[in-house]
A protein has these predicted regions:
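Surface-exposed, short loops/turns at beta-strand junctions within beta-sandwich domains
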Residues: 93-98
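Short flexible loop/turn segments that cap and initiate beta-strands
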Residues: 54-79
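Ser/Thr/Pro/Gly-rich low-complexity linker/stalk segments immediately outside membranes or between
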Residues: 24-40
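Extracellular interdomain linker/stem segments of modular secreted and single-pass surface proteins
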Residues: 29-30, 122-130
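Secretory targeting signatures
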Residues: 1-29
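Glycine-centered loop-to-beta-strand initiation motif
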Residues: 76-78, 82-90
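Enriched for extracellular/lumenal, surface-exposed ectodomains of secreted and cell-surface proteins
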Residues: 100-119
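Beta-strand-rich structural segments
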Residues: 37-56, 68, 104
Length: 130
């Protein structure tokens, strides 16, 4: 293959790469996780978040990772897939009464940015743990 053909192939590859980058940039959106649950729940209740884009459209069929940390730093991990309304739900169980921090993370896609939410949660089943 002569040098003119090689240069032509390289130019075509560069143009395709620029067009792909432009398309992805023009169609990319930021995402946001919004907590819909109360700050005080009990075992058996559900912790619910909704995933939305920058236009406030809900985002279905995406995985949200949850990490619930107690006061001592011990973590319980869950994941849930958003439904047709953008809601991801985790049913809480076997958590002692007390304060927790919930980290909710969406890892994004090629068209949606990664997002996370950190929220406080209090588990109160109506009894003392001692």
């Amino acid at each position: 293959m002569d040098s003119k053909k090689i240069i032509l192939v390289i130019v075509v590859i560069i143009i395709v790469a620029i067009l792909a980058f432009t398309y992805i940039s023009a169609n990319s959106h930021t995402s946001k996780i919004e907590v819909e649950s109360n700050k005080t729940l009990k075992n058996g209740d559900s912790f619910v978040v909704v995933l939305k884009d920058d236009r406030k459209n809900v985002i279905p069929n995406q995985v949200i990772d949850f990490k619930i940390l107690d006061d001592k730093g011990w973590a319980t991990k869950y994941n849930a897939t958003t439904d047709e309304n953008g809601h991801a739900t985790v049913k809480l169980f076997a958590l002692e009464n007390g304060n927790y921090t919930v980290h909710s993370v969406y890892n994004g896609t090629i068209f949606l940015s990664k997002s996370k939410s950190i929220s406080d949660l209090n588990i109160d089943d109506g009894y003392d743990k001692y």
